[in-house]
């Protein structure tokens, strides 16, 4: 990892902005979602849990667009690595990008808008946890697909800065999952218990 640092200036403003957006985004949506789950204040403010969830989802989408922009600007402002600047690496990056898009888009299709954007924190639950593709082949495919997108983008640009930022994306997602996965498992366990009692 240390060899990457020789190709970048960590004080460069666009790099700092990329780091901030990468760390902030999952922190923001987890804090807001937990707050909503405890207080239901967003649902009351917007008049319904669905409208509140849609509003948070739009905020998350806009933040993710900003994160991707900052990521790209950080790569463009730092030098390329000659050893990565070749056709093989470019097409490898393209493959990762394609793989990432497949997992992100298929996850969105399987979960729907509210399932993707934390609807369970708003009390909007599916009949059961989704286990169809891509969840049948990979846990948390939305997060790992997103990480693959950033990795592919970094490789296509022969960017050591992009590779380092991709590692940060992966670390932040792993930390987020430490909070998200137990919650999701628990709410569906509670739902199954309630349904069992009714039957």
Swiss-Prot record:
The keyword Transcription regulation is annotated on this UniProt entry: no
Side of membrane Cytoplasmic, spans: 67-93, 179-199
Pathway where it operates: Phospholipid metabolism; phosphatidylcholine biosynthesis
Sequence ranges on the Lumenal membrane side: 1-12, 34-45, 115-157
Biological processes per GO annotation: blastocyst hatching; methylation; phosphatidylcholine biosynthetic process; positive regulation of cold-induced thermogenesis; sphingomyelin biosynthetic process
Binding site for S-adenosyl-L-methionine: 98-100, 180-181
Main location: endoplasmic reticulum
GO MF terms, alphabetically ordered: phosphatidyl-N-methylethanolamine N-methyltransferase activity; phosphatidylethanolamine N-methyltransferase activity; S-adenosylmethionine-dependent methyltransferase activity
Catalytic activities: a 1,2-diacyl-sn-glycero-3-phospho-N-methylethanolamine + S-adenosyl-L-methionine = a 1,2-diacyl-sn-glycero-3-phospho-N,N-dimethylethanolamine + S-adenosyl-L-homocysteine + H(+); a 1,2-diacyl-sn-glycero-3-phospho-N,N-dimethylethanolamine + S-adenosyl-L-methionine = a 1,2-diacyl-sn-glycero-3-phosphocholine + S-adenosyl-L-homocysteine + H(+); a 1,2-diacyl-sn-glycero-3-phosphoethanolamine + S-adenosyl-L-methionine = a 1,2-diacyl-sn-glycero-3-phospho-N-methylethanolamine + S-adenosyl-L-homocysteine + H(+); 1,2-di-(9Z-octadecenoyl)-sn-glycero-3-phosphoethanolamine + S-adenosyl-L-methionine = 1,2-di-(9Z-octadecenoyl)-sn-glycero-3-phospho-N-methylethanolamine + S-adenosyl-L-homocysteine + H(+)
Pfam families xref list: PEMT
Family: Belongs to the class VI-like SAM-binding methyltransferase superfamily. PEMT/PEM2 methyltransferase family.
Family annotation (PANTHER family): PHOSPHATIDYLETHANOLAMINE N-METHYLTRANSFERASE
Role noted for this protein: Catalyzes the three sequential steps of the methylation pathway for the biosynthesis of phosphatidylcholine, a critical and essential component for membrane structure.
Protein name: Phosphatidylethanolamine N-methyltransferase
Species for this entry: Mus musculus (Mouse)
